[in-house]
């Protein structure tokens, strides 16, 4: 049972660290030579990349931000093979992983706690939990 708690805490930390990957900042610096947080709305996200640098720069940022949330949630599926984890526990852990990934995107440890708004990360996480909901948006 104690090992189960360690696994849950590890999953939450992994979700936060995945969310903390500042894709907009890294793509902006590597390919365009700018820190996106110094331009436009000063957010490190897809919308600001679209406004400042256009679609070509915004698309990979959206995909990476989407994947951060999706991977963070789908990694929690590993826990369903634990004998102590019930379906209700798994849903709760997924919701906490969503929160951790979005929090990591908004306050990324790798970018000085200055990130984006978390919309693409949230959409990816919701897709990981229940894909048909995304079609309604």
Provide a role label for each language-model segment.
Residues 20-26, 114-120, 136:
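Transmembrane helix boundary and interhelical junction motifs in multipass membrane proteins
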Residues 6-31:
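N-terminal signal-anchor transmembrane alpha helix
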Residues 51-78:
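Multi-pass membrane catalytic core of lipid/isoprenoid biosynthesis enzymes
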Residues 5, 9-13, 59, 94-99, ...:
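Hydrophobic alpha-helical transmembrane segments
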């Amino acid at each position: 049972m104690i090992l189960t708690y360690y696994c849950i805490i590890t999953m939450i930390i992994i979700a936060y660290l995945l969310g903390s990957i500042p894709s907009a900042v890294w793509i902006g610096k590597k390919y365009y030579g700018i820190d996106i947080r110094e331009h436009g709305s000063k957010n490190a996200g897809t919308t600001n990349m679209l406004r400042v640098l256009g679609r070509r720069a915004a698309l990979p940022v959206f995909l990476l931000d989407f994947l951060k949330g999706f991977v963070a949630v789908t990694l929690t599926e590993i826990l369903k093979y634990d004998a102590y984890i019930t379906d209700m526990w798994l849903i709760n852990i997924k919701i906490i992983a969503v929160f951790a990934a979005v929090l990591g995107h908004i306050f990324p440890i790798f970018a000085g706690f200055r990130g984006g708004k978390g919309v693409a990360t949230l959409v990816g996480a919701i897709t990981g939990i229940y894909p048909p909901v995304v079609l309604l948006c």
